[in-house]
Regions:
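N-terminal glycine-rich phosphate/adenylate-binding segment common to multiple enzyme folds
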Residues: 1-75, 81, 85-89, 178
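Solvent-exposed alpha-helices and their adjacent loops that cap or buttress functional pockets
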Residues: 7-8, 33-38, 113-114, 143-144, ...
Length: 179
């Protein structure tokens, strides 16, 4: 599947989230109606070909060509003992631009279809990781090119709280591959 994603350029993992009338939610062990179904209608857009999947795609490509997997070797990780495995998590400008532009295009489409304004929320961990800092910076650049769409940004930690507390406030959410 990962090879198909890359080969067919399926870079946007589109995950709609919609509540329907009569479907109860299990909260504190009890099924009940928590949110108004017509108020929760969002779409998560996750980058689908970079990040943690990139090294796996590279290894699959090498195997298909009959080439030997040449892992990047780091002799030690200060502070970690014993066996350690790791995967690089590259995030590119090109990959970020295309998935973020996709999110803005989807928000604009939903705005026309639903007749209500839509927002795009960027979710990342840009306070910690360099790849997410690039992703967030590109989101800010593209936001400025789309003044007709409201924007917000959050670290993944805070976003999980928003998702549970106020799901009706979310429309289109764009995330790097890790989340």
């Amino acid at each position: 599947i990962l090879g198909l994603r890359s080969g067919l350029k399926l870079y946007a993992n589109v995950r709609p989230i919609k509540l329907y009338p009569g479907v109860q939610h299990k909260v504190h062990g009890v099924h009940q109606q928590v949110w108004q179904p017509d108020m929760v209608d969002m779409v998560m857009i996750r980058e689908n070909t970079e990040g943690l999947y990139h090294s796996l795609l590279r290894r699959m490509e090498q195997k298909a060509k009959g080439e030997k997997d040449e892992p990047i070797v780091i002799e030690e990780f200060p502070g970690l003992e014993g066996e350690v495995e790791w995967d690089p998590r590259p995030i590119s400008r090109k990959g970020s631009e295309r998935v973020i532009n996709f999110a803005f295009d989807l928000a604009r489409h939903r705005q026309r279809k639903m007749g209500v304004s839509q927002s795009v929320t960027c979710v990342d961990k840009s306070n910690v990781t360099r790849g997410c800092r690039l992703f967030r910076g590109i989101f800010k650049e593209i936001s400025e090119q789309n003044p007709d769409i409201e924007t917000d940004a959050a670290y993944i930690d805070a976003f999980t709280m928003w998702l549970m507390r106020d799901p009706e406030d979310l429309d289109v959410v764009v995330l790097p591959n890790m989340f």
